[in-house]
């Protein structure tokens, strides 16, 4: 059975960025696991106006576990870091933990944020770079194992994907006032369209994505804003950048075609 490992920062990241893709690949027989670095205790409180950060973290953990069941995610691991403080970690701490988790899971694909963190969130960006470092070590380890057994199986090397928002989509959503033009003190630009290597059609899985998002009751404001445009053709797709295939960095060439699968 093939495996995908998602690595994100907060509960709901999995549903906003990859819910349709997860549902699609689970239906195709893949196992999907998720690592969440924090419990999102500094997020919106929504209906839970009296919740302390600790209580909100408990609520959001349960919301994520419920969403994971809707999507068919097999295992959810929380790393227990504090929301909003990932960039303050000593270099190597998060990276080493993620490497051990990736090595334990032995995934065919690892998916995390792109280098913009999609929304410029510092936690997202930290998770992106930490996961990339961990994946590089993992890919080298896999390469060593394949060499030891004399395997020449083409395509056996794992892949690292960045989930992203295309620059064109970000501009469109800003024009509609669906997202702000600035986020975390910087323009919300998204990733250059020319960097995107895979566009997954998730139109058949919009209802599953909706149900997963609706599990995140505490984040009702963001969920409602997203779902208000959920039937738009641009949001019937999820977008990815293939960053590494094994130990090889991947760049989109001018003659390369965008794939419709991971």
Where are these regions (language model features)?
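Active-site rim/loop-helix segments in enzyme catalytic domains that contact anionic ligands
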Residues: 1-105, 133, 137-140, 247-251
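Metal-dependent de-N-acetylase/amidase catalytic core
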Residues: 2-3, 91-262
């Amino acid at each position: 059975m093939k495996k995908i490992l998602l690595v994100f920062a907060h509960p709901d990241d999995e549903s906003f960025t990859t819910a349709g893709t997860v549902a699609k690949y689970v239906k195709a027989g893949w196992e999907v696991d998720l690592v969440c670095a924090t419990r999102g205790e500094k997020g919106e409180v929504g209906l839970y106006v009296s919740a302390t950060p600790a209580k909100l973290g408990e609520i959001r953990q349960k919301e994520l576990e419920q969403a994971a069941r809707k999507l068919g995610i097999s295992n959810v691991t929380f790393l227990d870091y504090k929301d909003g403080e990932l960039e303050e970690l000593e270099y190597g701490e998060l990276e080493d933990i993620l490497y051990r988790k990736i090595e334990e899971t032995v995934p065919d694909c690892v998916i995390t944020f792109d280098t913009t963190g999609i929304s410029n969130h510092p936690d997202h960006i930290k998770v992106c770079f930490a996961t990339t470092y961990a994946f590089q070590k993992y890919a080298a380890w896999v390469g060593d194992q394949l060499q030891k057994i004399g395997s020449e199986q083409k395509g056996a090397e794992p892949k690292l994907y960045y989930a992203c928002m295309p620059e064109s989509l970000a501009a469109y959503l800003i024009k509609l006032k669906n997202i702000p033009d600035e986020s975390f003190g910087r323009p919300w630009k998204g990733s250059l369209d020319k960097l995107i290597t895979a566009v997954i059609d998730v139109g058949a899985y919009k209802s599953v994505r909706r149900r997963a998002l609706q599990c995140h009751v505490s984040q009702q404001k963001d969920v409602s804003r997203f779902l208000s445009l959920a039937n738009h053709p641009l949001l019937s797709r999820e977008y990815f950048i293939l960053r590494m295939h094994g130990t090889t960095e991947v760049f989109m060439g001018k003659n390369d075609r965008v794939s419709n699968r991971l």
